Amino acid sequence: MNSLQVLTKKVLIETKAFSNYHEDDIFILQQLGLWWHNGPIGFCKQCKMVTSGSMSCSDDDSYELDRALVKAVKENQTDLIKLFVLWGAEINFGIMCAKTKQTKDLCIQLGADPQFLDVGLYNMFVYLVKRKKVLLAIEIYYDNILILDSFDSYDFHLLIDFVYNRFILYLDEKDEEMTRNALVLKFWYKFAIDFKLVKPIRYLSKKFPHLDIWRLKAAIYLGNIDEVHRAYFQENIRLDPNDMMLLACMYPQNKLGIYYCFALGADIDNALDILLRFDETNKQIHRETRGEIIFNIERGYLINIYFCISLGANPYIKKIQDTIKQKHSNIMILLFSKKKLLSPHSVLQNKILDPSDVYKMISTYENTESFYPFSSLAVKLIQQAK
């Protein structure tokens, strides 16, 4: 049962009674619990976003309702907790972050499952992944050592998909320096970059500037050229293009990442040589993956190899030929002997850096590509090599 005070706050906020307030009103609003962080609380019923002061729903700092609840629970804001639940926030998110017995008891009174901390943590993490709730997950798990320590080692590594993500999570870090807290942060940050979730990326880049170089590396590795363009040209976060190309080549089927490094000035012949030497690197990154995943990875690296040639890499120079012979790759020797088969693609010869134009160009290339690794011709050549 909600108090008259909470119901009154709900009405006042929903009717935007404080959208125009005087400086003299601030103290009164604070005392009445209608002031949160930098201004009067606002709520958009359409998009379920909680705002503060003059911010809009689309601002990086605005809060989706469940995330606002978690924040209020951390701050032990009793009336706000009740208010956010009244608007429809999921109270079980709140109980995960309750720091005091009083706040935990309040969450239970408002409908939280007392057993949730024992039986619901794993499913909640999976739910947040499926719904791509990056900022909510960060709010719940980051710096929540009690919750992180409640997972045993196997469950924790399973949750963050450690086999698949380990390489990118550990960029710039030594194994012994990585805490669960840092791993969870990087997992969700990487998740946002991978799925091009702009608002979470912008929020996290402001909150964790020490990860700016890692963010650029992750964006290159995952082929998120929108984020690479922003970091490189708007935020002046820079790396040597050849170092970036090494990362781009490590991710299967990464045409966007490889092209962007090429357009920034990376040596495309060197990129081809890197890819042809990737057997050991591939094992290092994916050493624990299953057989069917290995097949897709190998196919993905072949696509990268042919794409580099389409960009102008010369497979017939001595350096490349020596690498092929060192690798004892009969398949590559046969393919690269077909000089008319593998050649630069005319669509890709202009170096452009605007992401929207790059997407169009790559799409045109894929629609006009005459040779790709698993075409009937390629399969026939591979069978001959064997």
Swiss-Prot record:
**Which cysteine pairs are joined by S-S bonds?**
none
Q: Which InterPro entries match?
A: ASFV_MGF360 (IPR002595)
Q: Please name the GO terms of the biological process aspect recorded for this protein, alphabetically.
A: taxis
As given in the record, the signal peptide range reads: none
The organism's superkingdom is given as Viruses
> Which purpose does this protein serve, as stated in its record?
Plays a role in virus cell tropism, and may be required for efficient virus replication in macrophages.
Name the family the entry cites: Belongs to the asfivirus MGF 360 family.
Q: What is this protein called?
A: Protein MGF 360-4L
Classification of source organism? Viruses, Varidnaviria, Bamfordvirae, Nucleocytoviricota, Pokkesviricetes
